[in-house]
Regions:
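Short beta-strand scaffold segments in enzyme catalytic cores
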Residues: 4-9
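Short acidic-glycine loop/turn motifs at beta-strand connectors
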Residues: 10-14, 89-92
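Short, solvent-exposed loop/turn motifs
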Residues: 15-16, 104
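Short, solvent-exposed aromatic-acidic interface loops
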Residues: 18-29
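Cysteine protease-like catalytic core of ubiquitin/ubiquitin-like
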Residues: 29-35
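Low-complexity intrinsically disordered segments
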Residues: 35-113
Length: 113
């Protein structure tokens, strides 16, 4: 079963531009790879400018599907609708998820910094 994630940036207008990542979206994999291999604004832009991401590899490389493009969301809550995690680059990667009660929670990524 896939652990779905949205990955992106916060735009100047307050919206979030996010690309879907299908496999292994949990912080111990995608979060770790983003922090260790894609920890810059330029890298975040590169990720969201392509098609949907199939999977990330431990070395930082990734595979893409042939289709799909970035979506725009008005809030982290919207970006999490239907997804397990949302990763946003704002000076560094931040990770969000919904608790079992529906509250938005930030997941600590400092383990991999």
């Amino acid at each position: 079963m896939a652990t779905r994630a949205n990955i992106g940036i916060k735009l100047d207008n307050g919206q979030y531009k996010m690309i879907y990542s299908h496999w292994d979206g949990y912080p111990g994999h995608v979060g770790k790879v983003l922090v260790q291999h894609h920890d810059s604004y330029e890298n975040a832009i590169e990720l969201i400018e392509g098609t949907t991401i199939c999977s990330f590899h431990e070395d930082g490389s990734y595979d893409r599907y042939d289709d799909g493009e970035a979506d725009y969301y008005d809030s982290i809550e919207d970006a999490l609708h239907g997804y397990d995690y949302a990763y946003v680059f704002i000076e560094q990667w931040k990770c969000y998820t919904k608790s079992m009660y529906g509250n938005i929670e930030e997941v600590d990524l400092k383990t991999w910094r």
